[in-house]
């Protein structure tokens, strides 16, 4: 109910409301506010879930990238180590082969020197025998026949005196 009074150019409006209507209206407003709050709470909860899912996805992606980078570095490191080990193995093999060749060469030179030394001994012996034989040959007319065998370890020399 409304009543209007006009006094001295001022308007006075008196409104009398129905209490039941106003209580109903307030309860409706409270219910609307509660529904709005509930919807807002549900939406907030959904937004939080979506944000949590997205953050989890980002973290998983970051961890995956980090794991892949670590794996790549590990592969590179293993390859580098294998190359270094292969170079060391190759160097050791070359050093071993060089030492073996040097040992074989030294052994060959020593064997050659020993055979040459024996050969020189035999040659000196032959010269001595020939010198004595020439003196003896004048006295006896005999013929010398020799045979020489040279092996890796020793030298064999056979001389036969053939009387004619």
UniProtKB/Swiss-Prot annotation:
InterPro entries: IQ_motif_EF-hand-BS, IQCF. One of its GO terms (molecular function) is calmodulin binding. The keyword Lipoprotein does not apply. The keyword Repeat applies. PROSITE patterns: IQ (PS50096). Residues 43-72, 99-128 form the IQ domain. It comes from the Eukaryota. This is IQ domain-containing protein F2. It comes from Homo sapiens (Human). The lineage of its organism: Eukaryota, Metazoa, Chordata, Craniata, Vertebrata.
């Amino acid at each position: 109910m409304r009543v209007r009074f006009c006094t001295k150019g001022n308007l006075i409006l008196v409104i009398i409301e129905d209490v039941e209507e106003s209580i109903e209206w307030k309860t409706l407003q409270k219910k609307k506010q509660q529904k709005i709050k509930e919807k807002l709470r549900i939406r907030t909860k959904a937004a939080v879930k979506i944000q949590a899912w997205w953050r989890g996805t980002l973290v998983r992606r970051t961890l995956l990238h980090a794991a892949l980078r670590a794996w790549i570095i590990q592969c590179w490191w293993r390859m580098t180590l294998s190359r270094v080990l292969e170079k060391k193995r190759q160097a050791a093999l070359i050093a071993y082969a060089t030492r073996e060749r040097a040992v074989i060469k030294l052994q060959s030179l020593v064997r050659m020197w020993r055979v040459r030394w024996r050969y020189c001994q035999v040659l000196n012996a032959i010269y001595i025998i020939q010198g004595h034989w020439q003196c003896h040959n004048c006295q006896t007319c005999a013929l010398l026949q020799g045979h020489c065998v040279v092996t890796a370890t020793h030298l064999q020399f056979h001389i036969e005196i053939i009387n004619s």
